[in-house]
Amino acid sequence: MSNVPNELKYRDSHEWVRKEADGSYSVGITEHAQELLGDMVFVDLPEVGNHYRQGDDCAVAESVKAASDIYAPLSGEIIEVNSALASEPERVNSAPYGDGWLFRLKASDEGELATLLDATAYQTAIAE
């Protein structure tokens, strides 16, 4: 069974969200998603300054098996991307909740957090 940290929120499309000390939100893909995709070969990240609505496709993870769209879990502005992934996309595989984060955003509607899954609900969703 995949690791699903309790302190994170999730989308059923396998993105996770973590609130940072500065009020921004880090976003990545779940361990379950990276296991399904296999070894990452490239991650196409959004541009800093771009604005997305919740559910918009904003990035692409390319693995040896497939390319998969990554969706914005919250509406907001991209304020940082994990530039280390350009040369080390495998970080998404080795540390999906750590060094493999994809981008950070400034949420425009924190009320959208209520639409995300908690760890228990996400575990139930991926077990089906």
Curated annotation (Swiss-Prot):
One annotated Gene Ontology cellular component of this protein: glycine cleavage complex
InterPro entries according to UniProt: Biotin_lipoyl, GCV_H, GCV_H/Fam206, GCV_H_sub, Single_hybrid_motif
Cofactor(s) this protein requires: (R)-lipoate
Family per record: Belongs to the GcvH family.
One protein family per Pfam: GCV_H
Subunit structure: The glycine cleavage system is composed of four proteins: P, T, L and H.
Keyword list, A-Z: Lipoyl
Lineage of the species this protein comes from: Bacteria, Pseudomonadati, Pseudomonadota, Gammaproteobacteria, Enterobacterales
All copies of domain Lipoyl-binding, residue ranges: 24-106
PANTHER family: GLYCINE CLEAVAGE SYSTEM H PROTEIN, GLYCINE CLEAVAGE SYSTEM H PROTEIN-RELATED
Annotated HAMAP family: GcvH (MF_00272)
Record note on cofactor: Binds 1 lipoyl cofactor covalently.
Its job: The glycine cleavage system catalyzes the degradation of glycine. The H protein shuttles the methylamine group of glycine from the P protein to the T protein.
Name of the protein this chain belongs to: Glycine cleavage system H protein
GO BP: glycine decarboxylation via glycine cleavage system
N6-lipoyllysine carried by residues: 65
NCBIfam families given in the database record: gcvH, PRK01202.1
